[in-house]
Amino acid sequence: MSKFTFKILWLENNIAIAIDYNIGNNKSPLTSYFFWPRNDAWEELKIELESKPWINKNEKVDLLNKTTEIINFWQEKEKNTSLRKAKEKFPEFNFIGTN
């Protein structure tokens, strides 16, 4: 089981990304939601992760890489990328949203 879970709000004009920390069978919010393209979600998440010294560098890089992947995938939505396709591509993420 991964130590972290992504929560994604899949909206028509924005995507919002938050991360939970998994503790056993429970989850604890690690971050608030960061929006793209309204704000620079990637940069805001990077700053938030840097403020948590207990997360090792490799985990931070992995979380930021996954953030890049989901943002890039969302940006392709104009090419008929749907919420259903996002759920298929990222089954480990928790999605809420509209198409």
Swiss-Prot record:
Single annotated GO MF: structural constituent of ribosome
Major location category of this protein: plastid
Source organism superkingdom: Eukaryota
Keywords, ordered alphabetically: Chloroplast, Plastid, Ribonucleoprotein, Ribosomal protein
Subcellular location: Plastid, Chloroplast
GO BP terms, alphabetized: translation
Pfam family, one: PSRP-3_Ycf65
GO cellular component: chloroplast; ribonucleoprotein complex; ribosome
Family: Belongs to the chloroplast-specific ribosomal protein cS23 family.
Subunit structure: Part of the 30S ribosomal subunit.
Record function comment: Probably a ribosomal protein or a ribosome-associated protein.
PANTHER family referenced in this protein's UniProt entry, alphabetically: 30S RIBOSOMAL PROTEIN 3, CHLOROPLASTIC (PTHR35108), OS04G0461100 PROTEIN (PTHR35108:SF1)
NCBIfam families associated with the record: PRK02724.1 (NF002740)
Protein name as it appears in the record: Small ribosomal subunit protein cS23
